[in-house]
Amino acid sequence: MRPLALLLATALCALSACAPVAPARRDVVVGLVGEPASVLADHPSARVVAAAVTEALVARDATDEFVPRLAEAVPTFDNGDLAINYEDADAPGGRLVATFRIRATARWQDGRAITAEDVRFAWDEDRSAPAGSEQRLVAERVERVEVVSERVVRIVYRANERWEGYPLAARVMPRHVLLGASADVRAAYARNPMHAGPFAVAAWLPGYGMTLAAFPEYVLGRPGLGRIEVRFFRDRSATLDALSRAEIDVAPSPVLEADLARILDRLADGTERARLLTYYSAAEAVETLRFGTRFGDQRVRRAIELTVDRQALVDSVFAGRARVPRSYLVPPVWAAIDLGIPPRPDREQARSLLAAAGYTAGNFGILERGAERLILTIAVAEGSVARVEAAQIVAGHLAAIGIAADVRVAPLREVETLVASGAHDLAVVPELARDPQLATERYVGRIGPWFDVLAIAARSAGEPAEARALYGELQRMHLEVVASLPLYQYLSVDVAPRSLGGVRPTPHLAPLTWNSAEWRFTSP
């Protein structure tokens, strides 16, 4: 029997060795919260889809470096495609000029070649985008776009400025589709855009999800996946449940937040036994407590800084994973500097400062000064459970020194408008820091004339070292007057299968799908 058993075992081994290896998966299922009105809508779910469907001439990668996409190369001084024109009489400080060369293989998803005219058309479109939108802000940094040839375009930037993000000004839109198009055609395009990304919308089932099919002629090569399935959920709890049941593979930021760290540590800890891996990324963004005009007294702002225990807030909401910043600029932003650790809470000193400002305890211990009582509202931008929880903790801390604060959640645009006008009491808002110029401009006119002068100087600084020194001084001035109170550095959370290669979250909060062409499963 033994020889027979040995023979059978040998045969089984041979058969298993000859058995075909199961192919790696070619599809992935992504879960999103909320169904957008269109792919190009201003909605978190839309941005995740749009990043897979659209493409730019140049993008920022996961290390914050510029990388060419539709362009052959990133224009630089070294390769001769970036220059400063000092011969323009209207720009005594010089004018930045960048030349972009479109790859010969760059195609729209309908097969048409992408041309320099498409770049100029996109700039024309962006100039009429809603005021305050990212497209409009970027377009306004450009003086003009010149078509040099079919595949070469020159971008001339605003006078007397140096913009670190200059390569991002070159976008494309299909001129042959949208030029002269009716409102209905444009609306249909926004819902289902034909662009140049690695995936195209193949199907959209309202109320359920979408199918994105790989674009085989994608400029950087055929995508590693053949299909991305998108599923829409009502809220993050439903998405988390689907993730735990393996009904979806990927939950990209901001679907889940770092306040779920304890749950995610059990579900997606990245160990061999876990199917999922959680990516935590310190983002170039800050959740900030902004002061309204009624807090014009620096002593009162300092008292609030000494009252709010930001480290305790971070420990409570994020299990200590997030960082408490001191500045409106945070690493890895190139202009961020180290301003030391935040001061420890000192509520006795806070009470002394408030007393020096004329406040005394009134009925129910609420501080008052003459007819003014410190009963106020903290406006909170919706869209983040963690942000609302943080605002509630701030309100609790303020109550300890006699400031009665009620938390009111409102749409982001509404809260941003309040902050811009100063008509709010206090507000908790997200503030992007990836562009130091734009981040600084939020505080122009609010700190002092010298701050405004330095902000202008930083925009036109010729050398990176000079610009960083100026931004460093701007951050010190912001800190000295307590222009705002940075509560915590935003910590983005992305969850994906351990076996899905190519997943690379970015610190600048690009949608996780920014490099979806590189995604591929490394095992069945």
Predicted regions mapped to residue ranges:
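Alpha-helical secondary-structure segments
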Residues: 29, 115-122, 150-156, 197-198, ...
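Aromatic- and charge-enriched surface segment that lines or borders ligand/interaction sites
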Residues: 74-132, 154, 242, 296
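Gly/Pro-rich hinge or "lid" segments in bacterial periplasmic/extracellular proteins
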Residues: 60-65, 139-140, 168-223, 227, ...
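Detector for C-terminal structural segments
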Residues: 205-208, 214, 305-341, 346-351, ...
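N-terminal lobe/hinge region of extracytoplasmic solute-binding protein
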Residues: 31-90, 192-195
